[in-house]
Amino acid sequence: CLEYHRDSEINVPAANDAIFLLAKQQEIVDGKIDRNQAYDFAREKVEQVLEENPSIEVIIDLHRDGVPEDRHLVTEINGKPTAQIMCFNGLSYTTNNGPVEYLPNPYIQDNLAFSFQLEYQAAQYYPDLYRGIYLAGLRYNLHLRPKAILLEAGAQTNSVEEVKNAMEPFADILNRVLTGQS
């Protein structure tokens, strides 16, 4: 179900490098553009990719959490220090104002179901990996597919190695959910 590309021209790190260079050229990084606009900028590109590849069923928006500097979100899996992960779901609803009408998301329930399925599989196979599901008021581009999540992989206090180590069990969990394995 999941394919890993060793070719450095097409793998995720290569894509990350390309995105960083493009963002730097457009002055999106280094604090020059309001981060609140990041989802608007990303949405345009994601919609283009989805239009060109309509068979894409899953969107994973990968982030790291922001935590106090003395907090380290790490566990050990297969003898390796591994960053803990958390799904972040946007509800297009706030307690103070109710529905966020200008940010509709027809897939709120689908997105939540997907997150809960991931959480369930994590609890079965990697009980210390998953930090839970965080619910927030906006939509974070999760309206683009029924299986869309924002994944917090560790935090700024985790090493790159710890975050990379989290991707192996996450890929296993994702595969189990997408293929119906238990």
Predicted regions and their residues:
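Second-shell loop/turn segments in exported
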Residues: C1-L2, E9, I28-D40, K45-V49, ...
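Extracytoplasmic/secreted envelope proteins and their assembly/folding machinery
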Residues: R6-P13, D40-E47, S115, E119, ...
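Catalytic-core regions of hydrolytic enzymes
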Residues: A14-V74
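Solvent-exposed loop/turn segments at secondary-structure junctions
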Residues: F20, I28-G31, R64-E69, L91-T95, ...
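Structural recognition of the beta-strand scaffold that forms the well-ordered cores
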Residues: F20-L22, V58-D61, M86-F88, G132, ...
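A short, glycine/acidic-enriched catalytic loop
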Residues: P68-P104
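Active-site-adjacent substrate-binding region
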Residues: Y107-Y134
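Active-site-adjacent mobile loop/cap segments within catalytic or ligand-binding domains
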Residues: L129-S182
